[in-house]
From Swiss-Prot:
GO cellular component: extracellular space
Name used for this protein in its record: Somatotropin
Locations listed in the record: Secreted
PANTHER family assigned: SOMATOTROPIN, SOMATOTROPIN,PROLACTIN
InterPro entries, per the entry: 4_helix_cytokine-like_core, Somatotropin, Somatotropin/Prolactin, Somatotropin_CS
Coiled coil regions in record: none
Main function: Growth hormone plays an important role in growth control and is involved in the regulation of several anabolic processes. Implicated as an osmoregulatory substance important for seawater adaptation.
Highest rank taxon of the organism: Eukaryota
Family membership: Belongs to the somatotropin/prolactin family.
PROSITE patterns, per the entry: SOMATOTROPIN_1, SOMATOTROPIN_2
Binding-site residues for Zn(2+), renumbered to this chain: H19, E169
Main subcellular localisation: secreted
GO molecular function: growth hormone activity; growth hormone receptor binding; metal ion binding
Length: 187
């Protein structure tokens, strides 16, 4: 059975998000390993109480809800999550070689997801509202901060980026699986 354009696009998108998720994990663990143990404990405590900017994007709350979500819904949420990182990704801490890869990869992924949404819409105009939700680019993140506050912000941004890339990877993998006739799509 020949591979359809949609399956090929999904394979590329899943491969790209897996790479971005690995980059996010690497940036986060590099940042964590640069911290003192006490600093790390404090940041972990603070982060557990904080929210990511993207938490305002309505998404499935668990794997069961993810499994029940339509392909189009998973694609739309993925698009919004990727879009929400286009600007903040330029401020991620970490090695510049890694950081410089992120913005273009996010942009390519966003384009790919947009094509997948169009291919899976079947005339439904569900995508129009996604541009209505423009998240603030991490609020007051860009103010000049003291050293401790700057450290906390870098930690939050990297942790949120890692979390969101994991979400997108999960959603795209489930959506891709749904379009594959012989697949078992359990998480």
């Amino acid at each position: 059975q020949p591979i359809t354009d949609s399956q090929r696009l999904f394979s590329i998108a899943v491969s790209r998000i897996q790479h971005l998720h690995l980059l996010a994990q690497r940036l986060f663990s590099d940042f964590e390993s640069s911290l003192q143990t006490e600093e790390q404990r404090q940041l972990n405590k603070i982060f557990l109480q904080d929210f990511c900017n993207s938490d305002y994007i309505i998404s499935p709350i668990d794997k069961h809800e993810t499994q029940r979500s339509s392909v189009l819904k998973l694609l739309s949420i993925s698009y919004r999550l990727v879009q929400s990182w286009e600007f903040p990704s330029r401020s991620l801490s970490g090695g510049s070689a890694l950081r410089n890869q992120i913005s273009p990869k996010l942009s390519e992924l966003k384009t790919g997801i947009h094509l997948l949404i169009r291919a899976n819409q079947d005339g439904a105009e569900m995508f129009a509202d996604s541009s209505a939700l423009q998240l603030a680019p991490y609020g007051n993140y860009y103010q000049s901060l003291g050293a401790d506050e700057s450290l906390r912000r870098s930690y939050e941004l990297l942790a949120c980026f890692k979390k969101d890339m994991h979400k997108v990877e999960t959603y795209l993998t489930v959506a891709k699986c749904r379009l594959s006739p012989e697949a078992n799509c359990t998480l």
